[in-house]
Amino acid sequence: GLYAAGVIALPGISFEIIQVRVSDALLPMSMVFGLPAVVGLTIGTFVANMFSPFGVVDLLGGTLTNLVATYMAWKMARNFVFKGAWPFIAFLQVLLVTFVVGSYLYVLIGVPPTQLFGFVVPGIVFSWLGVFLGSVVSILLIGYPAAKAVARYLRAEPRYV
């Protein structure tokens, strides 16, 4: 519910090449809440992407991407025991979302080569960059600290977050 509400309420920044999907800040919560978060966020992504202008590709592609990102984070957080594991795992979520979502948005939108800081950047790179920057903000700068704070509050924080 919360994931879908955030996306539906902010469609202008949730469904574009340059996007900050604020609801993706919930993805690192799978490291805290495990399988219930994986299931809830996957269902929330599916519901949210029913409103996507990119149809079934975003509906299935985005949902499967977030399923893999949250499942991977849950499993890795349980098994990685080194300092800095949680931010590393959150960064892997950023990379997964960047390359999968950025790639299919590039194909669906047909992003042309774009002038960026005096350089011509291939459309696929521009697409990845747009999704990457937004994902860093939502997942790494908002989501990871929120997950860490919740884990600390619940006293579920392992020493390697």
Task: List each language-model region with its residue ranges.
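N-terminal, well-ordered alpha-helical segments
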Residues: D24-L27, L41, T45, T70
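Hydrophobic transmembrane alpha-helices
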Residues: G1-P36
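Membrane-embedded alpha-helical hairpins and interfacial helices in multi-pass inner-membrane proteins
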Residues: V7-R21, V47-V161
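Small-polar-interrupted transmembrane alpha-helices in polytopic inner-membrane proteins
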Residues: L2-Y3, L41-N49
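Membrane-helix interface "capping/anchor" motifs
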Residues: S30-L41, R78-W86
